[in-house]
Amino acid sequence: MRQTLVLDVVGLTPALLAHAPNLKALAAAGGLRPLTTVLPAVTTTVQSTFVTGLLPRDHGIVGNGWYFRDLAEVWLWRQSNRLVQGEKLWE
């Protein structure tokens, strides 16, 4: 079986690889493929789409924060796989 490494570095563009020689060498030895994003193009939404193959409307993660009505507060970066609906690629 061929092994695959997926390295998800938020905000890393091919132009920035010049400043990261080890990552550039890793990409050159293996491969580098562009990805198109989903909207909203924020970290938790995009990563949830990446690991489930589902659109935000289907996995339920539509931003980096969650509004809790009972507290009337937005909490940012609530990170838990339980928040993402849909089967993850490692399941």
What are these regions (language model features)?
Residues M1-Q3, G11-E91:
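Active-site nucleophile/metal-coordination loop of metallo-enzymes that catalyze phosphate/sulfate
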Residues V6:
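Hydrophobic "anchor" residues on beta-strands that sit immediately upstream
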